[in-house]
Amino acid sequence: MIAPPRKIPGLVPPGLILAGGLSRRMGSNKAMVTLGDAPLLSHVIRRVTPQVSDVTINAAITDKGSWAEGFGLPLLPDTLNGHAGPLAGVLAGMRHFRDRETAGSHFLTAPADSPFFPNDLVVRLCEHLSDDAIVIAASSGQLHPVFALWPVALADDLEDWLKNDANRRIRAFLARHVTIGVAFPPLETARGSLDPFFNINTPDELALARSQLETMET
């Protein structure tokens, strides 16, 4: 569904990095794999920090602490038990940012495994803010729901939705709400075009990201 854009001048939303995945295909915590000179998550933090008012990491916290403590940012665990996928992180963000005194209507999510997303991601998405619409990044005709501005007003609805264990697919939840897709062009590199929302799930994809990063740094 498409809603008319409503630009809100001066809005800088908070950001939530989704880092609660199980990394099954990588075989280890992919947020901590080395890309260039730093962990993958560090690249995401560097890229998102200038675009948002502040950054929080959605990651598990146990009685022994959290693997993400070393990044020096606030940590926000899922509010649901088990592993309910990215929507559980989105719900935690909705609750967290809705309850803050300085909270606006929306907050940004970005995944911990996508290091090359656009430097103007938030500016472009904010140009299309519209009440309770979910504003989603897109490329090559595909939506990327983990890169989105989420309305905090949907918290109760999302929590009710996730009470059914069958409701884990993010696109099924999106189908129930107004969404706005914002298209971004490919990233041009010395090795050719790259989807700016390319994400790293496997060792082969990590090798590709390392190769791409080398061309960007030379």
UniProtKB/Swiss-Prot annotation:
The lineage of its organism: Bacteria, Pseudomonadati, Pseudomonadota, Alphaproteobacteria, Hyphomicrobiales. Its EC number is 2.7.7.77. GTP binds at L18, A19, G20, K30, N58, D78, D113. Mg(2+) binds at D113. Transfers a GMP moiety from GTP to Mo-molybdopterin (Mo-MPT) cofactor (Moco or molybdenum cofactor) to form Mo-molybdopterin guanine dinucleotide (Mo-MGD) cofactor. The keyword Repressor does not apply. This is Molybdenum cofactor guanylyltransferase. It catalyses: Mo-molybdopterin + GTP + H(+) = Mo-molybdopterin guanine dinucleotide + diphosphate. InterPro entries: MobA-like_NTP_Trfase, Molybde_CF_guanTrfase, Nucleotide-diphossugar_trans. GO terms for molecular function: GTP binding; metal ion binding; molybdenum cofactor guanylyltransferase activity. Belongs to the MobA family. Disulfide bonds: none annotated. It comes from the Bacteria. GO terms for biological process: bis(molybdopterin guanine dinucleotide)molybdenum biosynthetic process. It is found in: Cytoplasm. The N-terminal domain determines nucleotide recognition and specific binding, while the C-terminal domain determines the specific binding to the target protein. Keywords: Cytoplasm, GTP-binding, Magnesium, Metal-binding, Molybdenum cofactor biosynthesis, Nucleotide-binding, Transferase. The keyword Lyase does not apply.
